[in-house]
C-alpha cells in the first residue's frame, strides 16, 4: 500500500482509543529560538535545545524547527481537520530521532526518524501575549527568502494547549519529502485576528510575472485516508460522532487565556502601577474560581 499522505481529516468516531499511549514528556524549557525565516511559503523558526520523550516514543526526539500555516480568512487555515472542522491556523513542531540517527537529513530517510507535533490556532477576540512574540518578529522577514535573529525571550511551553491528549498516525511531512509520525493536539490555542492577519502581509517568491505577492494562505487540503491507515487517540473516545473534541468548551478556554493575560499584567505592573496590578490579580482569582466550578459541571455532564 502507498504511504499515507499528510495532512488528513481526523474522524474522532473512527479513531482507536489506546490506553498504552501515555502522556508525552515535553522538555521545551531549554529550547531557544535562534533564527526566524520567511521561506517564501511559510514562517519557520529554528530552535536549539528542547526535546520530547515518553508516550509511545522509543527515545528522545530533538526539536528542530517550528512552521506556521494560515488561510485567507480566519475561518480556515489549518492543514489537519478534526471531524471536517478546519481551524484558523496550525503550528507544526518538527523533531528528529537524534539518538538513532546522526543528523536531521539522515533521520528523514526513515519512518521512525521524524515526529511532528501539530497545534491548532483558533481566532477569538483577544490577543495571545505569547504568540505575539512571534508576530513582533515578522517585520524583519517581510521579504521572501529572508531570515533574522530571533531577538526576543521566548518560551515555547507557553504555546502548548491546556490539554495534551493527542491523536497520532503515520503520514508524511507536509511537502511529502519524508515519512513522519504525527502527534496532533485537538485542543487549540487562541489568538487574535490581528495577529494572524500580520502573516498575510509577508511576501512570497516571485510569481510567473516575476513579481512577489503576499502569502495570503499556505495551508494544504487533506488527503483521503488509505484503507490501512489507523489513527490512534491517547484518551477515551466518549464524544458524539458529530462533535469535534477541539470545539468543546470554547468559553472555558477563553476564560483560561484571559486569566493568563491578567496574570501577565500583574507581573508587568507589580513594580509600578500597584493598583492596576492588584485589580489584575483579583481577576485571576475570580477567573480561577469560575473555571473550577465550570470544569466540575462539565465533568458531571460527561458522566451523565
Give residue ranges: language-model regions:
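Alpha-carbonic anhydrase
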Residues: 1-304
Amino acid at each position: 500500500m502507498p504511504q499515507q499522505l499528510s495532512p488528513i481529516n481526523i474522524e474522532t468516531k473512527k479513531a482507536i482509543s489506546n490506553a498504552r499511549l501515555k502522556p508525552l514528556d515535553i522538555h521545551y524549557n531549554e529550547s531557544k529560538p535562534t533564527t526566524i525565516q520567511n521561506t517564501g511559503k511559510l514562517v519557520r523558526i529554528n530552535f536549539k535545545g528542547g526535546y520530547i520523550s515518553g508516550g509511545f516514543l522509543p527515545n528522545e526526539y530533538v526539536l528542530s524547527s517550528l512552521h506556521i500555516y494560515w488561510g485567507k480568512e480566519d475561518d480556515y487555515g489549518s492543514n489537519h481537520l478534526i471531524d471536517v472542522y478546519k481551524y484558523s491556523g496550525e503550528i507544526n513542531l518538527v523533531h528528529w530521532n537524534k539518538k538513532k540517527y546522526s543528523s536531521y537529513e539522515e533521520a528523514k530517510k526513515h519512518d521512525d526518524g521524524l515526529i511532528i507535533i501539530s497545534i491548532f490556532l483558533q481566532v477569538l477576540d483577544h490577543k495571545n501575549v505569547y504568540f505575539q512574540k512571534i508576530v513582533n518578529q515578522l517585520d524583519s522577514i517581510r521579504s521572501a527568502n529572508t531570515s533574522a535573529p530571533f531577538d526576543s525571550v521566548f518560551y515555547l511551553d507557553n504555546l502548548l494547549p491546556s490539554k495534551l491528549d493527542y491523536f497520532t498516525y503515520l503520514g508524511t511531512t507536509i511537502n511529502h519529502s519524508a515519512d513522519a509520525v504525527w502527534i496532533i493536539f485537538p485542543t487549540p490555542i487562541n489568538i487574535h485576528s490581528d495577529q494572524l492577519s500580520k502573516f498575510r502581509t509577508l511576501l512570497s517568491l516571485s510569481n510567473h510575472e516575476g513579481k512577489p505577492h503576499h502569502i495570503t494562505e499556505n495551508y494544504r487540503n487533506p488527503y483521503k485516508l488509505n484503507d490501512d491507515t489507523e489513527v490512534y487517540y491517547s484518551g477515551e473516545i466518549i464524544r458524539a460522532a458529530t462533535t469535534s473534541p477541539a470545539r468543546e468548551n470554547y468559553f472555558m478556554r477563553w476564560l483560561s487565556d484571559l486569566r493568563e493575560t491578567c496574570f501577565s499584567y500583574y507581573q508587568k505592573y507589580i513594580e509600578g502601577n500597584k493598583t492596576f496590578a492588584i485589580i489584575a490579580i483579583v481577576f485571576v482569582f475570580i477567573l480561577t474560581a469560575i473555571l473550577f466550578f465550570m470544569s466540575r459541571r462539565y465533568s458531571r455532564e460527561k458522566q451523565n
